[in-house]
Regions:
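Short, surface-exposed loop/turn motifs at beta-strand boundaries within globular domains
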Residues: 117-123, 135-141, 149-151
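Transmembrane beta-strand segments of Gram-negative outer membrane beta-barrel proteins
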Residues: 67, 71, 112-132
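Charged linear interaction tracts used for macromolecular binding and regulation
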Residues: 111, 116-118, 186-189, 204
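Cleavable N-terminal export/targeting peptides
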Residues: 1-114
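Histidine/lysine/aspartate-rich catalytic loop segments that bind and position anionic ligands
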Residues: 190, 195-226
């Protein structure tokens, strides 16, 4: 009798432990919902015995300091503009007036941008993508994207990631929405690189919105092949959320097929997924 009760207790413990285990999505979402309360230690500054010394700056010192302060600000602004927007050398180069191509590899010499003398070669362009992502047979989903290009060097990127996971006889879900205003910093006929700022929203019981950043690029190796990389990042309650793509694309006129690797970081959980998808440009 005692032996049978021990067996029953052992089976109950094993089953309870297996059911208590959480999947990646559940663990990740819980880490995003639990805001880490950082104990703000009150810093007592012993300024009681500090003698307030009066600053005896002369007019010459003030003028000297303001001159170098203004010079530093101008130099910083000039450097930042050159790094983020355009340098004087690029202003006179062909990349300055590069037009948006109707679609990648419209001819064999250019990708997303084309050097042309025609005004308004293409005012706008819509790029649609949809990739099926899968880490294993229990964890998979879709990564949908819409990129609206305009004014030669800008675009608005909308993304929707939906992942589902089956664990312990239940199914969990995760959704990530993103909207970024992107500036295409490098616009050559063989390489397109961008950075972007915007917002990202996490649904499925988390329901948090946060500031988001992103960067990426696409290298057009040789028609019809290109290599794409993109990375989007946000922070929720001091936990990071990442959406990273590294894809090989095969272009067929206005359409393409892609395959590669996608990585997702959801708080404490990391997902490494195989990706395959399709896309179109209009």
């Amino acid at each position: 009798m005692l032996r049978n009760s021990r067996i029953v207790l052992l089976l109950f413990t094993i089953s309870f432990t297996s059911f208590a285990q959480s999947g990646k999505l559940e663990k990740g979402k819980e880490s995003l919902k639990n805001s880490s309360s950082s104990a703000s230690s009150s810093t007592s500054s012993p300024n009681s015995k500090r003698s307030s010394k009066s600053s005896n700056y002369t007019d010459e010192d003030s003028t000297f300091g303001s001159f170098f302060g203004e010079l530093f600000i101008k130099l910083f602004a000039y450097t930042a503009y050159g790094v983020l927007v355009e340098t004087p050398f690029e202003f006179k180069g062909r990349m300055h007036d590069a037009e948006i191509a109707h679609f990648a590899y419209e001819n064999s010499t250019h990708g997303n941008f084309i050097y042309t003398d025609f005004i308004n070669y293409s005012n706008v362009r819509f790029d649609f993508t949809n990739n099926f992502v899968m880490e294993n047979r229990n964890l998979y989903g879709n990564n949908f994207g819409l990129d609206f290009r305009f004014l030669k060097r800008f675009s608005v990127d909308f993304g929707y990631l939906y992942v589902t996971e089956k664990s312990n006889l239940k199914r969990d879900y995760f959704s990530l929405y993103s909207a970024l205003l992107k500036y295409h910093r490098i616009r050559t006929q063989n390489f397109d690189a961008w950075f972007g700022l915007g917002i990202m929203y996490i649904g499925c019981d988390v329901n948090k919105t946060s500031f988001g950043v992103g960067l990426g690029g696409e290298l057009f190796v040789k028609k019809p092949i290109s290599i794409l990389f993109s990375h989007k990042w946000t922070n929720i309650n001091n936990e990071e959320v990442h959406n990273t793509k590294m894809l090989l694309k095969y272009h067929i006129k206005k359409y393409h097929i892609s395959s590669g690797y996608e990585h997702f970081k959801i708080g404490v959980s990391k997902i490494n997924a195989f990706s395959v998808g399709v896309g179109a440009s209009f």
